């Protein structure tokens, strides 16, 4: 390990491979089935799915996808309509699917330093799969971004004065 657990941080897609293996081992299901049963169905997301092969990208509009192989990412890609991306984030962070202690952990971000180019945060941080930080105006933004050939997607949730709003932009 590069760090003693809890003392350091570095983003790594390999980390998501370990999460994939953990989900499959604990649930006894393939990742696709576990996501459908434990996330997509409970959150009411009928069109979101996992893409692991080029054939899985049929009908997905994401820039220059014709030459894109989602297999380069260990865990695959979540694909679906933008409105369901915003709903996923809103319902996941604002609902009761996850226990309160886990939501707190998801929001316990490790500070990453100063602003990151192309990101909305003045004071960015990273937690359990969640990018989070303070944006201009003092709003707390939580979410994530992703990119592929010819495309970028951002899904954010803003919580201010007890009210939340989520959006997704492609």
Predicted regions and their residues:
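Short, surface-exposed loop or secondary-structure junction motifs
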Residues: 1-145
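Short, well-ordered beta-strand elements
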Residues: 144, 152-170
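Short, surface-exposed coil-to-beta transition loops
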Residues: 73, 149-153
């Amino acid at each position: 390990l590069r760090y003693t657990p809890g003392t350091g941080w570095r983003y790594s897609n390999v980390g998501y491979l370990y999460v994939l293996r953990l989900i499959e081992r604990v649930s006894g299901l393939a990742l696709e089935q576990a996501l459908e049963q434990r996330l997509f169905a409970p959150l009411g997301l009928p069109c979101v799915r996992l893409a692991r092969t080029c054939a899985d990208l049929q009908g997905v509009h994401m820039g220059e996808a014709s030459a894109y192989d989602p297999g380069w990412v260990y865990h695959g890609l979540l694909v679906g309509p933008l409105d369901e991306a915003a709903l996923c984030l809103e319902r996941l962070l604002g609902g009761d699917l996850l226990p309160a202690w886990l939501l707190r952990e998801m929001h316990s971000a490790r500070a990453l330093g100063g602003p990151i180019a192309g990101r909305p945060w003045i004071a960015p941080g990273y937690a359990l799969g969640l990018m989070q930080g303070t944006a201009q105006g003092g709003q707390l933004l939580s979410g994530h971004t992703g990119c592929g050939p010819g495309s970028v997607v951002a899904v954010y949730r803003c919580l201010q004065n007890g009210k939340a709003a989520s959006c997704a932009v492609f």
